[in-house]
UniProtKB/Swiss-Prot annotation:
Biological or metabolic pathway of the protein: Purine metabolism; AMP biosynthesis via salvage pathway; AMP from adenine: step 1/1
Source species taxonomy: Bacteria, Pseudomonadati, Campylobacterota, Epsilonproteobacteria, Campylobacterales
Species the sequence originates in: Helicobacter acinonychis (strain Sheeba)
Protein's recorded name: Adenine phosphoribosyltransferase
CDD domains reported for this sequence: PRTases_typeI
GO biological process: adenine salvage; AMP salvage; purine ribonucleoside salvage
One GO MF term attached to the UniProt entry: adenine phosphoribosyltransferase activity
SUPFAM superfamilies, sorted: PRTase-like (SSF53271)
């Protein structure tokens, strides 16, 4: 990815102090989405990265991973699979719990997400990688369906929260912007 694109992206991601709670500096990508030419450049850069890998599906983590993942899946001409919070998918699902700062949460994927085909190649995508809990749980769901996650992709990776290091122990991890 070229440095000019990275700078453009950084300039168009809003930072919101004390959201969703005091002490957090939230990276809001909705401002980036307001600029179609810049969003297209982002998706084109990701398409260039993933086209040679012949992926079968893009797996997006709720909710902003749906935005990036759907656009990338369309650009690549492959299927899109959502990973959602527990209870949000209508058919039979697999569930994975993970730890949060104060308690636990669960995410789910449809049990037929990859059309019953084993060994498909997928890219996992979300807007931001912080502690890595949701991404690691998503990776477990992908493995449970006997798919191969060839890379986990994030627009932003927060280095100080160590999610990048944790995830890299399990899968190749790409963060376009490291903050």
């Amino acid at each position: 990815m070229n440095e000019t694109l990275k700078q453009e992206l950084l300039q168009n991601i809003r930072e919101v102090k004390d959201y969703p709670k005091k002490g957090i500096l939230f990276k809001d990508i909705t401002t980036l989405l307001n600029y179609p030419k810049l969003f297209n450049k982002l998706i084109d850069a990701l398409k260039k990265r993933y086209t040679p890998l012949n992926v079968d599906f893009i797996v997006g983590i709720e909710a902003r991973g749906f935005i990036l993942g759907s656009a990338l899946a369309y650009a690549l001409g492959v299927g899109f699979v959502p990973v959602r919070k527990k209870g949000k998918l209508p058919a039979h699902t697999l569930s994975q719990s993970y730890s949060l700062e104060y308690g636990n949460d669960s995410i789910e994927i449809h049990s037929d997400a990859f059309r019953g085909v084993k060994g498909v190649k997928v890219v996992l995508i979300d807007d931001l990688l912080a502690t890595g809990g949701t991404a690691l749980a998503s990776l477990e769901l992908i493995k449970a369906l006997q798919a191969e996650c060839i890379e986990a992709c994030f627009l932003i990776g927060l280095k100080e929260l160590l999610g990048i290091q944790l995830l890299e122990e399990q899968v190749k991890t790409f963060c376009l912007l490291e903050c």
